């Protein structure tokens, strides 16, 4: 859905790093190198970006109030 603002485990702010992370991946960084460049060293913070599935664009196509 939408990337969480803070890490669920340690509380570090990670919400502002999503777009930068995608930019690193577009410029052919590996996932690990991109996370290192963002300063995410803890496993808990790294998994927040690695495991995120961005579904917001797909959900915007649905209009539950229309029949």
Curated annotation (Swiss-Prot):
Annotated Pfam families: RNA_pol_N (PF01194)
Question: Which parts of the chain span the membrane according to its record?
Answer: none
Name of this chain's protein? DNA-directed RNA polymerases I, II, and III subunit RPABC5
Q: Which domain of life is it from?
A: Eukaryota
Q: Which InterPro entries match?
A: RNA_pol_su_RPB10 (IPR023580), RNA_pol_suN_Zn-BS (IPR020789), RPABC5/Rpb10 (IPR000268)
Principal location listed in the UniProt entry: nucleus
Report residues binding Zn(2+): 7, 10, 44-45
């Amino acid at each position: 859905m939408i990337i969480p603002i803070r890490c669920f485990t340690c509380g570090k702010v990670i919400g502002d790093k999503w777009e930068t992370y995608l930019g690193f991946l577009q410029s052919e960084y590996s996932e690990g190198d991109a996370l290192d460049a963002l300063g995410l060293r803890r496993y808990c913070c790294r998994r927040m970006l690695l495991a995120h599935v961005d579904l917001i664009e797909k959900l915007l196509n649905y209009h539950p109030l229309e029949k």
